């Protein structure tokens, strides 16, 4: 915290390290409950869900109960469905297209879609630096769904696209 950390993004949803919750409570800082199926080393080995939306929704309900019971303040919680973390193309597209479901949980929604593999799978652009168009398109769609926080690489380009998009919506 001496380094000026303003937010913790725990890709495990506080499952891999039981010390994280203590730090979050001690310093009273916002953190992201991130969804992942499995562990980083196994997450992409044939990911399966009964219903990707409802399974992840239920995961958030469970994790939110845990962190609230542990004493974390409501306004310090952000949720991230974890695009690309234990999900195939169909899962990712379903999550992005229906992400507004997660607003009913009552927390800000963060989505990290910048340069992701699903953009590669659709656009056939292998070089991650060639996925800006897909990142911008996905970001604008997420904004339309009410997503409050975007995690992106090309910050200026995404901000510009959002400004133009919002201005056009006014007319």
Language model features by range: what are they?
Residues 1-66, 86-171:
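Active-site-adjacent loop and "lid" segments of alpha/beta metabolic enzymes
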Residues 68-70:
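Conserved C-terminal portion of the radical SAM core fold
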Residues 73-76:
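Short acidic capping loops at alpha-helix termini that bridge into adjacent secondary structure
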Residues 83:
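Active-site metal-binding loops of divalent metal-dependent hydrolases
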């Amino acid at each position: 915290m001496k380094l000026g950390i303003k937010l913790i993004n725990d890709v495990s949803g506080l499952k891999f390290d039981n010390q994280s919750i203590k730090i979050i409570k001690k310093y009273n800082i916002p953190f992201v409950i991130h969804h992942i199926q499995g562990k980083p080393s196994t997450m992409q080995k044939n990911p399966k869900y009964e219903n990707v939306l409802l399974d992840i929704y239920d995961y958030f309900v469970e994790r939110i109960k845990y962190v609230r019971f542990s004493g974390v303040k409501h306004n310090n919680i952000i949720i991230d469905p974890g695009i690309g973390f234990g999900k195939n193309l169909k899962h990712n597209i379903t999550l992005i297209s229906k992400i507004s479901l997660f607003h009913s949980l009552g927390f800000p929604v963060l989505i990290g879609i910048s340069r992701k593999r699903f953009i590669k799978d659709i656009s056939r652009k292998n070089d991650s630096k060639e996925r800006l168009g897909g990142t911008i398109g996905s970001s604008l769609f997420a904004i339309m769904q009410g997503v409050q926080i975007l995690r992106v690489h090309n910050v200026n380009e995404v901000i510009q696209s959002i400004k133009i998009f919002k201005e056009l919506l006014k007319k």
